[in-house]
Amino acid sequence: MDPSAALHRRPAGGSLGAVSPALSGGQARRRKQPPRPADFKLQVIIIGSRGVGKTSLMERFTDDTFCEACKSTVGVDFKIKTVELRGKKIRLQIWDTAGQERFNSITSAYYRSAKGIILVYDITKKETFDDLPKWMKMIDKYASEDAELLLVGNKLDCETDREISRQQGEKFAQQITGMRFCEASAKDNFNVDEIFLKLVDDILKKMPLDVLRNELSNSILSLQPEPEIPPELPPPRPHVRCC
């Protein structure tokens, strides 16, 4: 996921001070320019019931890999990917949360700093769709009111086993102010990039112009260091988005 620095071996029999023939005669080796630093650092959290494919979506986007039998996430995990949108370089930190209820006290601490929230259900398992109101309560209780929301019906590759229609997903999203909806397949890599890039684009659209012009800004998009201990939970929000 994170790019690693390349390691160069010393030629056999050579020395650190040796000059290759190609560099003789006054020629100098050009130094490789360091990569441009990110203009913004931004956190996104993926939530949803166990087994809906949250980890698979994250790993497909960050590493372009897919695991048929991924182990359930314990607590939280994260990956980082740098993307470029609207002429800006964004370092995107994606938090993958456990779907089991016993981890809620841990994962809830990561909602507050998320500027985007991806809520995932499995189109082949009605119970994961029925759990969506529970996850919305978590969002309303812990997340920022300004967080962008995206509902994703995953496992579109299992169309023949579908239990939740696209219309049902769209109807649920329409009841939530500002929530977008799409269906995807981590296995077939369908709509995966679009999920994350559209979410980031929506976040950037809401940023003030003076913030967008300020490179390496310490604005509200700044990414905080990965906490070893979950941060203090924010107070409950004054109202909810849905019943």
From Swiss-Prot:
Phosphorylation of Ser-105 in the switch II region by LRRK2 prevents the association of RAB regulatory proteins, including CHM, CHML and RAB GDP dissociation inhibitors GDI1 and GDI2. Its main location: membrane. PROSITE patterns: RAB. Ubiquitously expressed. It is found in: Recycling endosome membrane; Lysosome membrane; Golgi apparatus membrane; Cytoplasmic vesicle, Autophagosome. Signal peptide: none annotated. Its cofactor is Mg(2+). Regulated by guanine nucleotide exchange factors (GEFs) including DENND3 which promote the exchange of bound GDP for free GTP. Regulated by GTPase activating proteins (GAPs) which increase the GTP hydrolysis activity. Inhibited by GDP dissociation inhibitors (GDIs). Mg(2+) binds at residues 55, 73, 96. Its EC number is 3.6.5.2. A motif (Switch 1) lies at residues 64-78. It is a lipid-anchor. InterPro entries: P-loop_NTPase (IPR027417), Rab12 (IPR041830), Small_GTP-bd (IPR005225), Small_GTPase (IPR001806), Small_GTPase_Rab (IPR050305). A motif (Switch 2) lies at residues 96-113. GTP binds at residues 51-55, 72-73, 99, 154-155, 157, 185-187. Keywords: Acetylation, Autophagy, Cytoplasmic vesicle, Endosome, Golgi apparatus, GTP-binding, Hydrolase, Lipoprotein, Lysosome, Magnesium, Membrane, Metal-binding, Nucleotide-binding, Phosphoprotein, Prenylation, Protein transport, Transport. Changing residue 100 to L: Probable constitutively active mutant unable to hydrolyze GTP; increases degradation of the transferrin receptor. The modification Phosphoserine is found at residues 15, 20, 24, 105. NCBIfam families: small_GTP. Belongs to the small GTPase superfamily. Rab family. Interacts with RABIF and OPTN. Interacts with LRRK2; interaction facilitates phosphorylation of Ser-105. Interacts with GDI1, GDI2, CHM and CHML; these interactions are disrupted by phosphorylation on Ser-105. Interacts with RILPL1 and RILPL2; these interactions are dependent on phosphorylation of Ser-105. Switch 1, switch 2 and the interswitch regions are characteristic of Rab GTPases and mediate the interactions with Rab downstream effectors. The switch regions undergo conformational changes upon nucleotide binding which drives interaction with specific sets of effector proteins, with most effectors only binding to GTP-bound Rab. This is Ras-related protein Rab-12. It comes from Mus musculus.
